Amino acid sequence: MNIIDTHCHICSEKLLPLHEEILKECSELNMEIIEVGYTLESSESAIRLAATNKDIYASVGIHPSEYTAEKPEELYSRLYSLSLSPKVIAVGEIGLDFYWQSPKSFQYQILELQLDLAKKRSLPVIFHVRQAYHEFYEFIKPYNFLSENAVLHCFSSDVSWARSFLNLGFYLGFDGPVTYPKNDALRQVLTFCPHE
């Protein structure tokens, strides 16, 4: 059985010293990896890493908390160019994050541009949402092309929100917090979700 980790940041500064060890272990486990971009630079790094290994793929995107003064049209143009790499299989990590102080207007604008990119390139989307489930849901509902083409990574809300996103055809990703001893509510969401 192959394992696919759909959300990695192996190129992050913290993991660079362990880079070779991680890649070796993944290879031994027959694991495929999606190295997820969250800035232009990390998207470029993801593509470079993917080019070195047949089991690594890349996504390109601007995380909602990664505010930049660069014009949105320029960001779009650069992301579009990056998305043409044959190892790019998704757009992400994109979404809304109201925990950090990134301007909401920027977050909505860059989210819309990146959804346009995903649609034009027929790529699935990796979403990041934090303290913005209602706003994100209302914004995303009209984007029908996302049905069965989107994952909401590190899901951390309740069964009601899980049901809402599953009804849109989204996949939900669960990360480390589901293992925390006091996080029974999130484990309840996990048991509610379909196995695939």
Model regions: which residues?
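Mid-domain alpha/beta scaffold segments of enzyme catalytic cores
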Residues: 1-196
